[in-house]
Amino acid sequence: FNGKSYRMKEHIDRLYRSLKYVRIDPGLSNEEMLEISEEVIRHNEHLRPSGGDFNIRQFVTCGPGRSTKEAGPPTVGVTVAPIDFSRYAAFYDDGVHAVIARTRSYSSDALDPKVKHHSRNNFAMADLEAAREAEDG
């Protein structure tokens, strides 16, 4: 999107719905998070290649503590990193071998699918499974 954020307000609104669900108050309004995110983008604009884009990530944790009950204050962060589109170029030219992994996402009985979270262990497990499958042919 040539340096312009795409639907960031909707992304932040979803994040805040998830925070409400898990009972974490980030100490910032949705609008403040949006302003901070846009400022981080502006501050790092010199890192974005011409015609490139950023991966933008906002995160909120319950903060330091041995348990969620003892934690606080919350830790809030916003990161941006240039997206390396060149790593995908060969996929367009040559195609890519795909594997449907047996590893699944979290059960909706364990975690409400509406919750925006950064637990990606199931993705890592699926990547390992796909790599083994590719090695085995």
Summary of predicted features, one role per range:
Residues 1-136:
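Conserved alpha/beta cores of soluble small-molecule-handling proteins
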